[in-house]
Amino acid sequence: MTKPVNLLPSRIDLFDKIQSAIKEAEEIDKAKEAQEIDKTKEVQKPEPPPLLFIFWGSRGSGKTTFLNTVEEKLSANSDIEILGFWNAADFTASTLSSSIKETVDKKSSKTKLILIDNLDSLLQDSSGKELFDFESNALLPLIQREDTIIIAASQIEINLWQEYDVRVRQENHQLTPLKIDEIKEFLLETNIDSDHAQTITFGHPKMLEEFIAHPKWTSKEASAYANKYFLEGFPADTKELTEKASIFPVFDIFILRKVMEDETEDNQKDQTDMLTGYNDKINELTRRWIVQFDVEAGAYRFTDDAVRRLISRNTELTLNDEFVRIHQIAAEYYQEEAKNTSYLAQLFVSSIYHLAHSQSGKSKGTPGAICLRWVRNMQNKWFGANWEQVLSVWESGNHAVSEEIILLIGSKYYSKITELLSENKIRSEV
């Protein structure tokens, strides 16, 4: 099968996963047919392919466009039959299950394909009952048929299925912000410079569309639009927490408490009530899939780096004193926490990130020199650190955060810190 020319590279990779599953499903059908023809002959069946694909991304990341393109491209494939496109937001779990079941039962092709947009709309009930009803009444029977591939879009990653047969046959794939080469392709029919567009939008598809419509936008105007768009419908206090949380690559409730509360106030809230309030707001952000808990980091992070950077920049441009204050508090907090060698891998990047930001208003080269000096001063105190893990997170962790750090401290100092980590790794292995 040829690759669709109007899909960007990262989306082509996702499209290929669907094509591979279709091909594998067809091979299984052929193996079954061969077994039916000659029951005495042992036929080796291929590994069962995924039958449920969930493509998830932030608001405006191009989920519906991706589904429409998949439908258009696969409609030319005579080996499969596309049964329909459902918008889950227009149904209850019961009516969606019935509609899909009725359509599937009427068809007889070997390999069927159904597309479902806004699958996360079935998660409006925090108990998940609607989604699990849909799982048991529609997804499980479809997967057990072995002849239907389900392609769904969602604003959140969905993988906590109750049924084992669903869990083992599903895959989640994120629609990430576009890389610079994809931005160039996105802007082919415009006169907009791709590097400038990357700076303004951080590669978010919705923001790129808006930038094409408003090519004279400044960073401040784009960030203000993003803040309004991504935080639409949030209560004022949750919006404030989100704006401050966006300043952190990763965050936990303890650092949020430090930056959200004035601990010098005489009439502080009851600690339990305060922590409960923060937890409630963070839970709302996770339900809206603005943030998610990162098990490896042991902290929360934004699900979309472009969204985080756009909101953070809006805070920097509109509340600069507060932005600097938060980075100063965070730098002190993470440097203190990083004294615990056991958690260095989880804390090192945040320590550098906030230290660099806290010094960013000073002369050129100062942030990088200060960060390098901190690492040199601390390295002999990090006895027994897992340097391989620290180096791995530093070099291969969050690309967007690494990009920000390089912009803050310069590639020269980034390389020097990398060299120090590598030297410590080598020494620890001797």
Where are the language model's segments positioned?
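C-terminal boundary/linker of central alpha/beta nucleotide-binding cores
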Residues: 227-317
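A eukaryote-biased feature capturing mid-to-C-terminal, repeat/solenoid-rich segments of large proteins
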Residues: 220, 231-233, 311-348, 362-402
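Short glycine-rich substrate-engagement loop in P-loop NTPases that contacts/grips substrate
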Residues: 85-104
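Conserved catalytic segments around the Walker B and adjacent sensor/switch elements
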Residues: 52-54, 75-91
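Alpha-helical sensor/transducer elements of the RecA-like P-loop NTPase core
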Residues: 65, 120, 130-196, 200-210, ...
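N-terminal pre-P-loop "Q-motif" helix
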Residues: 6-22
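Walker A/P-loop nucleotide-binding motif
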Residues: 49-67
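Conserved P-loop NTPase "ATPase switch" module shared by AAA+ and STAND
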Residues: 107-133
